[in-house]
UniProtKB/Swiss-Prot annotation:
Cross-referenced Pfam families: REF
Protein name in the entry: Stress-related protein
The family this protein is said to belong to: Belongs to the REF/SRPP family.
UniProt keyword terms in alphabetical order: Stress response
Keyword Ligase: no
Induction description: By cold stress.
Length: 248
């Protein structure tokens, strides 16, 4: 009895070592694609008519040539996926060490909100049973907004300072990369232009009485500019060794 338990323990550990922790969905997707391709191939072969003997001959030749190679390397893709999975695990561990605890708590709250989705779905289902599609849509929108707005504002207030700090730091780092300043000269003004157009469109539709516009967030362009100015990290581009601030 003790010997059988001792044998089962190494097998269990070996099975856990062979199990993917983060990229198992890739393996499942690959198996699904292979099954679909095999089914499609079998269907095409069965309906190939007079070409079926030729297809079977080619299939036998391919199996003869590829078979030994497959037997030798069939486990390589999984081992490569396992290697990447372990790297992802190490990266997540390092990220958890460096991410501020404030962000972790906010992330937990976001997960809690996501877990409440089934309750909201039940409320929506019961609401749809009432007559009037337009009234139902309005009630659903108000219900979602009233339930999510407090949590969203709380998460935003916690994430904003951390996100602003990392944004300034990331801009400083990116601005040192070759060719990035030249790309920024094109991208930043374009992004600012379309952000302003978006804000104008949302404001216009809200003034015209469209309900959906009341729930669309505006892009805080002025706040973004102020963050970079306060951090002494106004987006700049380097030309001839001189850093020139980009126009707002």
């Amino acid at each position: 009895m003790a010997e059988s338990e001792a044998k089962q323990q190494p097998e269990t550990v070996h099975g856990e070592e062979k199990r993917l922790k983060y990229l198992d969905f890739v393996q499942v997707a690959a198996i699904y694609v292979i099954v679909c391709f095999s089914s499609l191939y079998e269907y095409a072969k069965e309906n190939s008519g007079p070409l079926k003997p030729g297809v079977q001959t080619v299939e036998g030749t391919v199996k003869t040539v590829i078979g030994p190679v497959y037997e030798k390397f069939y486990d390589v893709p999984f081992e490569l996926l396992m290697f990447v999975d372990r790297k992802v695990e190490a990266s997540i561990y390092e990220l958890e060490r460096h991410v501020p605890s404030l962000v972790k708590r906010a992330s937990c709250q976001a997960i809690t909100v996501a877990q409440k989705a089934p309750e909201l779905a039940l409320a929506v289902a019961s609401e749809v049973q009432r007559p009037g599609v337009v009234d139902t849509a309005k009630n659903i929108t108000k219900n979602v907004y009233s339930k999510c707005e407090p949590t969203a504002k709380e998460l935003c207030s916690k994430y904003e300072p951390v996100a602003e700090q990392y944004a300034v730091s990331a801009w400083r780092s990116l601005n040192r990369l070759p060719l990035f300043p030249q790309v920024a000269q094109v991208v930043v003004p374009t992004a600012a232009y379309w952000s302003e157009k978006y804000n104008q469109s949302v404001s216009y539709t809200a003034e015209r009485g469209y309900t959906v516009a009341l729930y669309l967030p505006l892009i805080p362009t002025e706040r973004i500019a102020k963050v970079f100015q306060d951090g002494s990290a106004l987006p700049t581009v380097e030309t001839n060794g001189n850093a020139i601030p980009l126009a707002q």
